[in-house]
């Protein structure tokens, strides 16, 4: 019988073969091919990472950091390649959420039944 880790590796390969993953790959390639979208996407990622790193240390971001993040997010969301990427990311996240519910169902049952 395969181990849990073997099954996880199989699931990772299945994820890569899924339509959602392929759509994400295509959408991301379109963002990278569009200079304006790629630049805006990069700026957003940098601003978001900066805030996440502060929060992971238990620190609050400064108002100007939050403003920069919001500004870059608004700029990015106005660009079609990034809008399209966001939709595809949401679809993939929905699928992963459903998979997570299936995987963790025994844990939920354990806690609810005891």
From Swiss-Prot:
Species of provenance: Oenococcus oeni (strain ATCC BAA-331 / PSU-1)
Lineage: Bacteria, Bacillati, Bacillota, Bacilli, Lactobacillales
Protein name: UPF0342 protein OEOE_0901
Record-linked Pfam families: Com_YlbF (PF06133)
Highest taxon of the lineage: Bacteria
InterPro entries membership: Com_YlbF, YheA/YmcA-like_dom_sf
Family per record: Belongs to the UPF0342 family.
């Amino acid at each position: 019988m395969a181990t849990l880790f073997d099954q996880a590796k199989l699931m990772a390969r299945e994820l890569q073969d899924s339509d959602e993953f392929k759509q994400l790959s295509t959408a991301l390639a379109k963002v990278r091919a569009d200079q304006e979208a790629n630049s805006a996407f990069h700026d957003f990622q940098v601003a978001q990472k900066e805030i996440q790193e502060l929060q992971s240390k238990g620190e609050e971001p400064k108002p100007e950091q939050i403003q920069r993040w919001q500004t870059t997010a608004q700029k990015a969301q106005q660009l079609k390649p990034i809008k399209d990427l966001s939709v595809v990311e949401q679809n993939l996240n929905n699928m992963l959420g459903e998979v997570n519910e299936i995987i963790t169902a025994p844990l939920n049952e354990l806690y609810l039944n005891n």
